[in-house]
Every structure is written in structure tokens, then in C-alpha cells.
């Protein structure tokens, strides 16, 4: 499937928003709802990891196709339907300009085409989607294929912000693009700070931190300077939660009133977690989330206690 054909399938973010949701109609709180978060489908990593060649490996991705198909089937069976399905980056393993990237992308788009048309997809960029040090060209390629790399949208009175976390990791090759996101983010946080929304939530690929705001710098988190500056901005604006991936394990912690949620992968696991998805229920007062293995969600769906929250 070409990028143009994919455009007919996905409500891709354009103009820094997602047209699947009307910002005018969705700005008011209408009661509890839920969404599903996934991360790191990363077609190709399981083969690359198994052979110890993560840089040049990844010439097979049949396992990831089957796992993502299982995730889509599980989501489609959910009742009531989630408001949306967000994929928090590393959609494919092949970096920009490397072998198998087009094939991996085409296969992922084909699998995602099966998501129920009433469940919009929200696509977040990861380091494998843009390169560890993105350029204007790699960002443009992502935008053409999947939609804007950062944007905001409203659902039921909740403001959702999607960030390009590679700009926070290494923007040395595209400083002007980072500045543009920074300026845009300040504008969005101003809306949240004025309490014009019931809650405000951020999606990005790389976590601010894995367990603690004061932890050491690591491949899997943002540097202390960057994370502390961003965490202060987010908490000052009243952001309630940041949902991310990248770690291929479940993790997370809190900073002041901010919940940092790190979800394991649909694809390759690097720890002891199972291939899975996170269900996130939003009520007037709280945000409750739970990670399910693909088998659990396929067979049992959302548990009754979470469903009860949706009736409040």
C-alpha cells in the first residue's frame, strides 16, 4: 500500500490536529471514556534482536505481523469501543534510508487497515521512524507516510498532545523544527493551564524517565536537564499523565502530580513482560490504566472494574 492509499485508510494528523475528532464538538466533558495505547510494533526487531544484529538485521517480521494482527483483533472485539487507538512510536524497525523500510511500512499499514473504522488511529513518531538524530527529510517522510509528527486533539473535554520526542533527544540536525515544536507546545500548555479542559494528557515515544525524575541518563530516557525542564512545564500546566513506549518493558513513576506511564511493546520484549496493550479509562476525577497481554485482552476484554468506571 502506498502512502497515498494509506491516506484513504487513516485519519492522519494534518495542520497540527486530527480531523477524526471535531475540536468544537469534543471540547466539552461528556462523561467517562477509554482509549487503548500500544507501542513498538517495530516490524523487524524480533529477528534482528535474536541474531544480535540490531543495526543491520531485521529482514523478517512475520512474528510482528501476527502480534499486531492479534492486537487489532482484540481492539476490534472490545465493547464498548475505545475512543481511539494510539501507537506510541517505533512503528517499524528499519531506520530511514535502510533496507526493508518500505516493505515493513507497507505491511504495517496493511495490518492497521483492519482496525475498526469507528476507532481512529493516533500515530506517534519514534526514533526508528525518524532516526536517532532526525533531519528535515526524515521528519517530512514520516509526515507524508503517517501524518504530522506533533499535534493536538480533543476528545470528550480532554486535551491530548502528541509530541515528537526525538526533538528532545537530539535536534542537532534540525534545530528550527525543534524550536517550532517548543513554541507550539507552549501555546498548547497555555490552554491546559487556563483549565479549559477536564484533563490534559501527553503521548510521546521516549519516556521522560523510567522510574524517577532523578535517575541517571540512559538510552531509554531523556537527559536530566531536558526531562526536568519539560516535567516542570507539564506539571505547571496541569498535565496529568505522559504515556510512552521505547523501553519494551512496563515501567513508570510519578513526579509531583504527573504520572509517567511506560508501556511495553506489541512487538519485541526486552524484559519479562508480555506482548500487550494498555487500556486507559478517564473519569471526571482520575485516569486509571492497566496493561493487558494480547491473550488476556483477546479472551477476556476489559475487566469489570474498569467498565464500572465508565458508568460514573
UniProtKB/Swiss-Prot annotation:
Residues 47-250 are annotated as: Catalytic. GO terms for cellular component: cytosol; plasma membrane. GO terms for molecular function: metal ion binding; protein serine/threonine phosphatase activity. Its main location: cytoplasm. It comes from the Eukaryota. Its cofactor is a divalent metal cation. It catalyses: O-phospho-L-seryl-[protein] + H2O = L-seryl-[protein] + phosphate; O-phospho-L-threonyl-[protein] + H2O = L-threonyl-[protein] + phosphate. Protein phosphatase that dephosphorylates AKT family kinase specifically at 'Ser-473', blocking cell cycle progression and promoting cell apoptosis. May play an inhibitory role in glucose uptake by adipocytes. Belongs to the metallophosphoesterase superfamily. CPPED1 family. This is Serine/threonine-protein phosphatase CPPED1. It comes from Mus musculus (Mouse).
